[in-house]
């Protein structure tokens, strides 16, 4: 075996003895909150809160106009046809589908979609698209885009785009794949994030042919090239948090046998975001985060709290195989997102949404690393292998990082030497081209740094609006074209790629960079700036993590963390940020008086980089704008009959639930002693959280010790240690639980 073959970890710090250190514990006094002094900002029931967000008259933040709020394209996915002629862009914020020539020689075309799109795939032959989206009212649209050419070797001939079918499929579709069977049937495979399900759908009728339980929050999925297996990755852990082993899971559905296999990942693997398969379909590569939740959050250096990785799963056996680290020793690769392979199997490319970078990886060397693993190596062995450049010959580094500076880099496409990356926050497509001219000669490091110290290539969060500017000439040309197409709502400007300075990480390697706007450079509202900052790992010291590392979608990651604000050794379950600014105090222990205080403390003590007040206020604005996602337990947006009965019980003296959890926020904003104190806790009273969206915030309580609301109420006797819930009939217990899960 070639012992010099590197894995993707540059120099892994030794952890031997690293957890033995002294800590200073500050004791905090708790201040009672006057509930009468806090005036709710929303209407008096949770259903009007839903409609305020999901209805046509969504609230506009103070000081902004509706035009500001709705003026983003927000591309959520894109495809490039096999001929390399057309990009198809799903405009997640604008609710449209765009087709634009890749060479920039013609204006774009677009059509409105019946919902806001999330993901899409070509049908075989590239004459149609399958598009899923729509959030809690999830749908599948079939869009005709072309007709097959009479010449079987020629590309399809474009047609005016039109929606030919639109089917309801379930709550929050998160990914989609398509296949054509031997008998000519077209089947669509989709995952439903908040129904924990995968679907097989007949594209001709919209009928759901098969449905599988695939665990918590399936977020990304791929169909193997032979169409026999469907690989599904859960976004966050589905395990208890008060344990020493917690992680997300990957499942493989054998479509022929109709069987589902599951593999757990390594401890701490979470936030699985995107997936691609090796060209032969043998391996699934998944972008993810390694959460070191057993560490005290006393520092962030060297990935102490979180590291950034991609995972390898054997598709046929459904076994976890390996983890490869994307970080460098003193510079994290925060929040990996899009991941894609080249068709020739030579290159793997990953976008880093948190650091505005793209990572080039020689896929052949990854596969060789896997093939050369000794038989005795356990899964994850490569996590502890050092990157060491070959001494006999100069090779390409296993990892090349190139900075774009555009925010929200997400979905990725690889075509030969060209890489395209979608920039969600910039309404843009980025392009990088890798040019190799061996022999190679190393510069001192593997960064795309040329003669500039690598740290200077990073964009600090203090300048979140410091993004690449279009040249005056390009901006004028863009404005002219935009004006010419403004009268036609279905037209748009052509792609005009603006060249950025090329990067040369080592002699013999050049990476050209450019980007093309889908619309004029977005004018950021305060709320949008806050959203960008929340996703920005450059706001963190050494760029290891962002707020979404522990709070995806500003909700929960399912882990317990040991924050220093209330001592050490007493881990607490991650809280959702939903309504945090409306329901003080903050933190489970109530240690922060309000969310504004918590936001500023989070920058200082979790990201270890102080934010200026302007940026902190922007994050406040973003978090304050969050609205609940309607529960999957609702029926057509309303309480079920069971939940209606449960509501009566919830508000009655028989249960007393509404004493601590009164509407409209389902919290009295106070600390309570409910018997949930852990042996390591310094306090015995904890914040009464909002129950809104409690259906998605498991595991429950400060300890994260209950999988379900049923376990919490009936086994944990939460708030009912006198046994009052035991006196309910089984039907009444079911009704009460149904209501709580409907909030």
Go through each PLM region and give its residues.
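Periplasmic c-type cytochrome electron-transfer domains
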Residues: 273, 286-287, 291-298, 306, ...
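Hydrophobic beta-strand positions that form the internal "hydrophobic ladder"
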Residues: 87, 129-130, 188, 230, ...
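Surface loop/turn motifs at the tips and blade-to-blade linkers of beta-strand repeat domains
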Residues: 67-71, 110-114, 166-171, 211-214, ...
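A short helix->beta-strand "capping" segment at the edge of beta-propeller domains
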Residues: 42-74, 321-325, 389-405
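Beta-strand-rich domains and repeat architectures in extracellular enzymes and scaffolds
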Residues: 63-95
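Short, solvent-exposed loop/turn segments at conserved positions within beta-propeller repeat blades
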Residues: 92-93, 135-138, 193-194, 240-247, ...
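Residue-level detector of Asp-centered blade-edge/turn motifs that repeat once per structural unit
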Residues: 82-83, 124-126, 180-184, 225-226, ...
């Amino acid at each position: 075996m070639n012992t010099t073959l590197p894995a993707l970890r540059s120099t892994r710090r030794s952890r031997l003895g690293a957890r033995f250190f002294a800590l200073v514990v500050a004791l905090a006094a708790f201040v009672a909150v006057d509930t009468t002094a806090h005036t709710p900002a929303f209407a008096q029931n949770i259903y009007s809160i839903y409609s305020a967000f999901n209805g046509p008259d969504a609230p506009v933040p103070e000081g902004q106009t509706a035009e500001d709020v709705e003026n983003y394209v927000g591309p959520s996915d894109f495809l490039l046809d096999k001929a390399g002629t057309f990009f198809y862009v799903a405009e997640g914020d604008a609710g449209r589908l765009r087709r634009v020539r890749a060479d920039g020689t013609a204006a774009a075309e677009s059509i409105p979609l019946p919902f806001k799109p999330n993901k899409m795939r070509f049908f075989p032959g590239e004459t149609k698209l399958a598009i899923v989206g729509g959030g809690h009212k999830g749908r599948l649209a079939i869009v005709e885009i072309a007709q097959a050419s009479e010449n079987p070797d020629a590309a399809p001939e474009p047609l005016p785009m039109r929606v030919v079918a639109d089917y309801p499929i379930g709550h929050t579709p998160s990914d989609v794949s398509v296949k054509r069977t031997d008998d000519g049937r077209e089947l669509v495979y989709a995952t439903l994030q908040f129904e924990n399900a995968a679907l097989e759908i007949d594209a001709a009728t919209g009928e759901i042919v098969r449905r599988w339980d695939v665990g918590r929050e399936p977020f990304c999925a791929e169909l193997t090239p032979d169409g026999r297996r469907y690989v599904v990755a859960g976004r966050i852990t589905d395990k208890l948090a008060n344990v020493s082993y917690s992680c997300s899971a990957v499942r493989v559905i054998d479509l022929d046998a109709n069987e589902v296999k599951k593999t757990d990942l390594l401890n701490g693997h979470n936030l699985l975001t995107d997936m691609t398969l090796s060209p032969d379909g043998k391996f699934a590569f998944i972008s993810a985060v390694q959460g070191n939740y057993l560490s005290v959050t006393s520092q962030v250096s060297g990935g102490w709290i979180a590291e950034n990785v991609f995972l390898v799963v054997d598709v046929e056996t459904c076994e976890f195989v390996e983890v490869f680290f994307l970080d460098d020793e003193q510079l994290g690769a925060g929040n990996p997102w899009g991941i894609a392979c080249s068709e020739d199997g030579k290159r793997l490319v990953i976008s880093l949404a948190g650091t505005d970078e793209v990572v080039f990886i020689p896929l052949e060397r990854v596969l060789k690393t896997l093939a050369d693993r000794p038989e005795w190596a356990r899964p994850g062995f490569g996590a502890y292998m050092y990157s060491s450049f070959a001494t006999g010959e100069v090779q390409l580094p296993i990892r090349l990082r190139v900075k774009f500076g555009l925010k929200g880099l997400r979905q990725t496409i690889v075509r030969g030497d060209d890489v395209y990356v979608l920039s969600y926050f910039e309404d843009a497509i980025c392009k990088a081209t890798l040019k190799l001219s061996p022999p190679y000669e190393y510069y001192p490091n593997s960064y795309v740094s040329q003669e500039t110290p690598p740290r200077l290539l990073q964009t600090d969060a203090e300048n979140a609006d410091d993004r690449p500017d279009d040249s005056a000439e390009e901006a004028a040309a863009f404005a002219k074209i935009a004006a010419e197409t403004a009268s036609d709502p279905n037209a748009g400007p052509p792609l005009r790629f603006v060249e950025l300075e090329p990067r040369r990480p080592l002699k013999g390697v050049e990476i050209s960079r450019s980007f093309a706007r889908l619309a004029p450079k977005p004018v950021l509202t305060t709320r949008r700036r806050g959203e960008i900052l929340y996703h920005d790992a450059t706001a963190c010291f050494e760029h290891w993590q962002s707020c979404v590392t522990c709070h995806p979608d500003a909700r929960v990651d399912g882990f317990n963390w040991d924050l220093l604000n209330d001592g050490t050794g007493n881990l607490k379950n991650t809280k959702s940020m939903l309504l945090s600014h409306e329901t003080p105090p903050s933190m489970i222990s109530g240690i922060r008086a309000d969310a504004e205080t918590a936001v500023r403390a989070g920058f200082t003590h979790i990201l270890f980089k102080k934010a200026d007040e302007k940026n902190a206020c922007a994050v406040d604005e973003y978090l304050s704008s969050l609205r609940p996602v309607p529960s999957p337990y609702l029926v057509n947006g309303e309480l079920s009959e069971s939940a209606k009965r449960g509501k009566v019980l919830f508000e009655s003296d028989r249960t007393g639930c509404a004493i601590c959890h009164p509407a409209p926020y389902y919290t009295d904003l106070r600390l309570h002693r409910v018997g949930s104190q852990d042996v390591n806790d310094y306090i015995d009273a904890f914040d009464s959280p909002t129950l809104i969206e409690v259906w998605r915030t498991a595991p429950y309580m400060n300890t994260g010790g209950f999988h379900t609301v049923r376990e919490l109420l009936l086994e944990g006797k939460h708030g009912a240690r006198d046994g009052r819930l035991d006196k309910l009939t089984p039907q009444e217990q079911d009704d009460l639980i149904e209501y709580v899960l409907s909030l």
